[in-house]
């Protein structure tokens, strides 16, 4: 399983973006996502921007990574709640939108 890190673009260089996220700064390739602007949010894996995301999605991913980190550290995460709606709590129609499916009857 691959885990992307949400990072915000702080500066632009030709073919690269200097990004900050989860307490670190990285120079990442922007070849897969094209031109970036300062303030954009990117999903980064192996020092390469893989996807453009919005601020809400970045915060959802950060919250999920925080929960995962707490569990890995053995902290009591039994009462941890994500700051977004889990797919298991969504209606069929919402799942269809989430998965870009046109037919929600298969859910």
From Swiss-Prot:
It comes from the Bacteria. It holds the Pfam family HupF_HypC. The keyword Cell inner membrane does not apply. Keywords: Plasmid. The keyword Ligase does not apply. One of its GO terms (biological process) is protein maturation. GO terms for molecular function: carbon dioxide binding; iron ion binding. Disulfide bonds: none annotated. Belongs to the HupF/HypC family. Possibly a metalloprotein. This is Hydrogenase expression/formation protein HoxL. It comes from Cupriavidus necator (strain ATCC 17699 / DSM 428 / KCTC 22496 / NCIMB 10442 / H16 / Stanier 337).
